[in-house]
Amino acid sequence: MEVGVGIHIIADFYGVDSELIATTERMYPIIEGAVEYGRLTKISSDYYQFRPKGASGIVLLAESHLSFHTWPEYGLVTLDIYTCGDPKTADDAFAYLVDKLRPTSISTRKIVRGDMIEEAGENQIEEAALH
């Protein structure tokens, strides 16, 4: 049985409008909107503007975090969405970002974090019994 503590979505968005991702001013409402749409609990956030263009940001969530980095010169946005609890929250936040950023292609990995908890616990019990 697979047991996990959270869902981690790692994604690269290609072909995104360079003007849309060039500044924190443009990215801020999109990222904050994803947090709201995903019904995530924001603790704090921080954004950084690169010169002449490009942006990075992270939202600390009660459920974990959402972070991004942009490369407008390549039309690239890299995303990290990690949530504990209901996996639908990560999926909803991700879907919101796809809708708002409109990439022409996406590379995605979805990982169940802590999926070996039971297995690790069993191994520890077996090893303790041998000593």
From Swiss-Prot:
Its cofactor is pyruvate. It catalyses: S-adenosyl-L-methionine + H(+) = S-adenosyl 3-(methylsulfanyl)propylamine + CO2. The record marks E63, S64 as: Cleavage (non-hydrolytic). It comes from the Archaea. Is synthesized initially as an inactive proenzyme. Formation of the active enzyme involves a self-maturation process in which the active site pyruvoyl group is generated from an internal serine residue via an autocatalytic post-translational modification. Two non-identical subunits are generated from the proenzyme in this reaction, and the pyruvate is formed at the N-terminus of the alpha chain, which is derived from the carboxyl end of the proenzyme. The active site is at S64, H69, C84. Keywords: Autocatalytic cleavage, Decarboxylase, Lyase, Polyamine biosynthesis, Pyruvate, S-adenosyl-L-methionine, Schiff base, Spermidine biosynthesis, Zymogen. Its EC number is 4.1.1.50. InterPro entries: AdoMetDC_fam_prok, S-AdoMet_deCO2ase_core, S-AdoMet_deCOase_pro-enz. Binds 1 pyruvoyl group covalently per subunit. One of its GO terms (molecular function) is adenosylmethionine decarboxylase activity. One of its GO terms (cellular component) is cytosol. Pfam families: AdoMet_dc (PF02675). One of its GO terms (biological process) is spermidine biosynthetic process. Catalyzes the decarboxylation of S-adenosylmethionine to S-adenosylmethioninamine (dcAdoMet), the propylamine donor required for the synthesis of the polyamines spermine and spermidine from the diamine putrescine. Belongs to the prokaryotic AdoMetDC family. Type 1 subfamily. PANTHER family: S-ADENOSYLMETHIONINE DECARBOXYLASE PROENZYME (PTHR33866:SF2). This is S-adenosylmethionine decarboxylase proenzyme. It comes from Thermoplasma acidophilum (strain ATCC 25905 / DSM 1728 / JCM 9062 / NBRC 15155 / AMRC-C165). The lineage of its organism: Archaea, Methanobacteriati, Thermoplasmatota, Thermoplasmata, Thermoplasmatales.
